[in-house]
Amino acid sequence: MQQHPKHRLRSDKPVDSRLNNMRIFLILVFSLFVVACSDYQRARSAYEGGDYQKAFELFKKLSESGDTRAEYDLSKMYLQGIGTKQDVGQGWLWMIKAADHGNTMAMVELGGRYEYGVNLERDETQAVFWFKKAALAGSSVGSYNLAKMYMDGRGVKQDPARGYAWMVISAQKGGNPIAKAEADAYKAKLSPELQAKSDQMVKQLEADPNF
């Protein structure tokens, strides 16, 4: 009978140790996050203060450590030749990295550049690809731009119901009154059959954005 409490105490000790290790790990992760945030803010402050060379150096350092916000900012500086010599190749490299790492602003900008052929050959199919990727990642702007592509049938087969649905989702995600007004005006032009299909499409995309 005396062995049970002893056994319990021995098994509790490593549990406490693991909990302490977990606390230490979480503290370290949080500390690194705070440092990364403060470093990024220093880079932004340098940029907004006109010290572009310093901002470029800070963004580059952060980008090399995987900060997606810095990757996007660095790409813009390369593309525009701010704080460094213009290098379109490096600009694209870092913008694609930022997009691949989940930066929705980079995704939307890539879509826009493909849509209008800025610094590259115009490709509306690629524009749809990046707008959709941004929309699926929760971007209201990405959803809006994707809606327009479906409505106009650019880079994708024209689909009024799907275009309307993505416009509604854009309005819901971003609280965008323009998107809401455009969705309502667009729906009013549709036949009753397409209006019903559009309403159903909204529900389907809300349940499964990949639908």
Each language-model region and where it sits:
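Short helix-capping/linker turns of helical repeat alpha-solenoids
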Residues: 50-51, 64-67, 80-82, 87, ...
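Terminal, low-structured helical/coil segments at or just beyond the last alpha-helical repeat
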Residues: 177-211
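Sec-dependent N-terminal signal peptides
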Residues: 25-33
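Hydrophobic face of amphipathic alpha-helices that form TPR/SEL1-like repeat modules
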Residues: 45-46, 62, 73-80, 109-116, ...
